[in-house]
A protein has these predicted regions:
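Acidic, glycine-rich flexible loop segments
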Residues: 94-152
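Glycine-rich short-loop/terminal segments
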Residues: 1-116, 120
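Active-site or metal-binding loop neighborhoods of secreted/extracellular toxin and effector enzymes
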Residues: 132-192
């Protein structure tokens, strides 16, 4: 793939949007088990890995994306957390650190919240929101495209990537990289 130094090409933006759509569709339309590994994930991972690699491999983001075992580990932990908290409300949990062997901490700061949106005698909805902030090392020498804002609409208006880059220095270095992913899952469950 060829990369424009001023930003993603139209076809690349479309490819990324489609990959994310496929990825989230697989999550939204499935139950607990599919969170561990789903059809759209390899395609999304492959595209993001190629994109980050084209810009250099000195960022934590690339390390995380390239570490499929860490991603699977994180998904398994998310599944366990949802199952353990069925019917409960969890306050936001903050994780810190730069340990690449743990996906939750390798992002630097991860906030996860689970909330029961609606429940009845037959079941309830669990809404899980994950906000990830990627704060790059100040000494990073990786150049990123001049892309001030990138938004992907999924199913009638949900913003999946609110900002691809929050701030850009004049030289093209990313100061902050933010992603927002929101999952709404239906969990079949009979209340006692």
């Amino acid at each position: 793939m060829a990369y424009d130094p001023k930003g993603l090409t139209a076809s690349e933006v479309t490819q990324l949007a489609n990959a994310i759509d496929t990825w989230l569709d697989a999550v939204n339309n499935s139950l607990f088990g599919s969170l561990g590994w789903f059809v759209g994930h390899p395609y999304t991972l492959s595209f993001l890995t190629r994109y980050m690699h084209s810009m250099g491999n000195q960022t934590l983001s690339y390390d995380v994306i390239a570490n499929e075992a860490a991603i699977r580990f994180a998904n398994d932990r998310a599944v366990a957390a949802i199952k353990a908290g069925a019917g409960c409300y969890f306050d936001r949990v903050q994780k810190g650190g730069w340990e690449n062997d743990d996906f939750e901490t390798s992002l630097g700061a991860v906030g996860i919240s689970y909330k029961v949106a609606d429940q009845s005698a037959k079941g309830f909805y669990v809404k899980a929101t994950i906000d990830d902030w990627y704060d790059f090392h100040a000494q990073a020498t990786v150049e990123f495209p001049y892309l001030d804002y990138f938004a992907c609409d999924w199913k009638g208006g949900n913003i999946i990537y609110d900002k691809w880059m929050d701030q850009l220095a004049e030289a093209g270095f990313a100061q902050r990289f933010r992603t927002h992913i929101e999952w709404t899952l239906f969990v079949p469950y009979t209340l006692e």
